[in-house]
Amino acid sequence: MSRIGVRSEEEVRQVLDALNECPAVKLTGAFMHFAAADGDEAFARKQFDTFMRLTAPLPAGIVRHAAASDASIRFPWARLDMVREGISLYGCPGVQSGIPLRYAMSFETRVEFIKTLPAGETVGYGRTWTAPRETRVATLGVGYGDGYLRSASGKAQVLIGGQLCPVIGRVCMDQILVDVTDVPGAQEGDCAVLMGRQGEMEITPDQLAAWAGTISYEVMLSPHPRVPVLYYEEGK
């Protein structure tokens, strides 16, 4: 990946020489990272073979690891002494594996306010959305200041009352607007799921990422520290 590390036997020797001059520093392991574990296996194998060749001179007993989530699933030959499970711990299937993963994270907020707009009324900054009919609009207490990506403006949907509701207008710093005309039972205080399951419906990290033009890793890392975090075990 050309980020950090060594690329040749000579560089390995330089590192070992430097370590020999620092007796307080003990070499305990070596690792690599696949550039495209979800892509061309031939290139991944080439990376792996290079890693094994360069680490061959290292002291016996060190820990070698190469495989993160996708590689640990696709490439059994790359598991070595340990694996680095990351996104798979969140239940996201980076590659099609047949493993029945369950999403471990949701992102939720509440309906703060509901109003009815006449046809032709515009909403939000820049007036980017115009009501095509009389429309019930819910204001939700979340925005890009909370980590709900602004790039999802006008494309994302949320779950209210077990139904998908489109985000309308631009995502604001602290609020978003949602069309709840087709959810007549929606009311202030209702839970709105931005990412996660509600009833029989689910918005996955990959789906939210597609709306925002990014990847699932980013949407799962986006919630701001000001967003309360609740941890559940066995539903409690």
Residues of each region from the PLM?
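Active-site loop/helix belt of alpha/beta enzymes
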Residues: M1-A119
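C-terminal accessory subdomain/extension
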Residues: T116-K236
